[in-house]
């Protein structure tokens, strides 16, 4: 078994549309364990730190504006190959191209407002978790 942790964000559009419970339920039903969960509003500084890998790209400013436009849900999920499992569950970035049955395929018609974010590698997961969560907010059980 290759137990991993990954970070998932339910973005402001997902929160606004009342999709929190549905999205969390999908991950739980898959067998992923929630290690941390909170609602927060990203500051501009925190959003820029989180998305620093995209700094300088044409969409960076609009991404930061979107991610700071309302509350988000942040969670750490753990399970066997959690990173790739979650990535398959959420689907491709562009909701218009995401297959039905994936979170983005079922709930997004956009590339920019695509309901969820998930870490794409173990290194990204570690960095992103450190940006969003303090050590004492992560529960081992």
Swiss-Prot record:
It comes from the Archaea. Its cofactor is Mg(2+). It is found in: Cytoplasm. InterPro entries: NDK-like_dom (IPR034907), NDK-like_dom_sf (IPR036850), Nucleoside_diP_kinase (IPR001564), Nucleoside_diP_kinase_AS (IPR023005). The keyword rRNA processing does not apply. PROSITE patterns: NDPK, NDPK_LIKE. Gene3D superfamilies: Nucleoside diphosphate kinase-like domain. It is an enzyme of class 2 (transferase). Major role in the synthesis of nucleoside triphosphates other than ATP. The ATP gamma phosphate is transferred to the NDP beta phosphate via a ping-pong mechanism, using a phosphorylated active-site intermediate. This is Nucleoside diphosphate kinase.
């Amino acid at each position: 078994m290759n137990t991993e942790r990954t970070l998932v964000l339910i973005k402001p559009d997902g929160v606004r549309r009342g999709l929190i419970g549905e999205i969390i339920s999908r991950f739980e039903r898959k067998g992923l364990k929630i290690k941390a969960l909170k609602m927060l509003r990203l500051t501009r500084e925190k959003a820029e730190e989180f998305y620093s890998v995209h700094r300088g790209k044409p969409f960076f400013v609009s991404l930061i504006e979107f991610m700071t436009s309302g509350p988000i849900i942040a969670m750490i999920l753990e399970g066997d190959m959690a990173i790739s499992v979650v990535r398959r569950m959420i689907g491709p970035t562009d909701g218009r191209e995401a297959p039905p049955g994936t979170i983005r395929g079922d709930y997004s018609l956009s590339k920019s407002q695509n309901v969820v974010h998930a870490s794409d590698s173990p290194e990204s997961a570690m960095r992103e978790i450190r940006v969003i969560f303090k050590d004492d907010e992560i529960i081992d059980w």
